[in-house]
Amino acid sequence: MGSSDGTTTTTTVQEIADATITRLLAAGLIQPKGQKQKRVNWERQISYEYLQRFYPDVPHWTRIEVGPMPPGENSFLYSRTRRWADAVVREPQNMLLIEFKMKAMPDVAAQLLNYKDLLPQTPLFYKYKDLPIKCRVVAALCDDQTSKFIKSQGIELEMFKPMNYEKWYTEKILKK
């Protein structure tokens, strides 16, 4: 190849490939060799934003295990078989169980109803066992059929779009 000063410059295929790979890595479009692409926890973002906006000064727990602990010395081993609720909020008159979904699906209703049964058996929440328990799904997207089903189970549905909604929608729904 000729350069502007009249000298000849040779660029190998390997140099072009290396430069291209460097640009793709810098843009975040590919991952370095041997490194797995990080999985985005979309629900963690929606839960954080929602709780900070609506319950900043209210006692709440996130990613909390619910259910009884088996008695005995090996109870820690069984703790991994317990269920995990996205959030539990202590409201003035009740406990509120929340599941966060970017796209709500019908199975979230069964999930919440199961957690509702397990919450009073959770050691951390024994002192609240006599309070009513409400269930809520907070979702960024939900179709009409799923919405009707969730509500028919006595579960509240609240629509809430977090800051990462457009990115999630593009990657997961439009598959771009």
Please state what every model-predicted region is:
Residues 2-176:
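Charged, terminal alpha-helix-loop-beta segments
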